[in-house]
Amino acid sequence: MSKEVISEEGQVHQHGKDYVDPPPAPFFDMGELKLWSFWRAAIAEFIATLLFLYITVATVIGYKKETDPCASVGLLGIAWSFGGMIFVLVYCTAGISGGHINPAVTFGLFLARKVSLLRALVYMIAQCAGAICGVGLVKAFMKGPYNQFGGGANSVALGYNKGTAFGAELIGTFVLVYTVFSATDPKRSARDSHVPILAPLPIGFAVFMVHLATIPITGTGINPARSFGAAVIYNKKRVWDDHWIFWVGPFVGALAAAAYHQYVLRAAAIKALGSFRSNPTN
């Protein structure tokens, strides 16, 4: 087991560890606005979310317009489309922006002090704008089928109530954000650094598995930007009536995943208490 030693200056030195926990991000840092790397990351989130929505919603519309089930990708293909695109885009953008592509993921990482409030807000705006543009491209290229088959928008399916849909979104997002925390944990990253695809792969696979479970209930949101972009472009009352589910459910799921990972699995509360007790100046 590793041991923490606190020096007189209050610095924590960790022995026997082959990894270093990064320091917490500042809560709010206006200085980030002056950095090109900050805006480059926001642009990367915008483009990644645009591409994600274009490919996935186009896949959904293509599936729905096929009259022969054997000629379409099926629900399994839709799930692979979402999971596969997340795998590809996280792999491409992780080194630039962290590869969030999802306001719920950004929110969870903010709660864990991985990103500042300012960065989280800018990322969410970029993600929502990218989602709107991505779905807009689908409508421009496939206008007839797009309008006819629901625009890929999320809503509560017939036979399910809003409580069930909310629970499905909450649990689905918990699975995703929990996987993000686990895949990007410094301990695991140090151990698996020689295989760079090991972080994007489980994240994409989590998205795939959640889609298999929740497509019949809500069409699978677990990403407020995905749901918002589709709702804005499709713009039907039924979609907007259910829309709150696709923000509140994922954000509550992200909150639960962040708390579980930080305070149960990583035992952040116990470590903080131990450091407090071992420092005689406190």
Curated annotation (Swiss-Prot):
Motif NPA 2 mapped to chain = 223-225
Give the UniProt family note: Belongs to the MIP/aquaporin (TC 1.A.8) family. PIP (TC 1.A.8.11) subfamily.
Q: Where is this motif: NPA 1?
A: 102-104
Q: Which GO terms describe its cellular component?
A: membrane
Residues crossing the lipid bilayer are 39-61, 74-96, 116-138, 159-181, 201-223, 243-265
Q: Which PROSITE patterns match?
A: MIP (PS00221)
One family from Pfam that matches here is MIP
Concerning CDD domains, the annotation shows: MIP (cd00333)
Compartments where found = Membrane
Q: What does this protein do?
A: Water-specific channel.
According to UniProt, the name of this protein is Aquaporin PIP-type
Q: How does it sit in the membrane?
A: Multi-pass membrane protein
At the highest ranks, the source species' classification is: Eukaryota, Viridiplantae, Streptophyta, Embryophyta, Tracheophyta
Which terms in the Gene Ontology molecular function aspect does this entry carry? channel activity
- What is said about the domains? Aquaporins contain two tandem repeats each containing three membrane-spanning domains and a pore-forming loop with the signature motif Asn-Pro-Ala (NPA).
**Keywords tagged on the record:** Membrane, Repeat, Transmembrane, Transmembrane helix, Transport
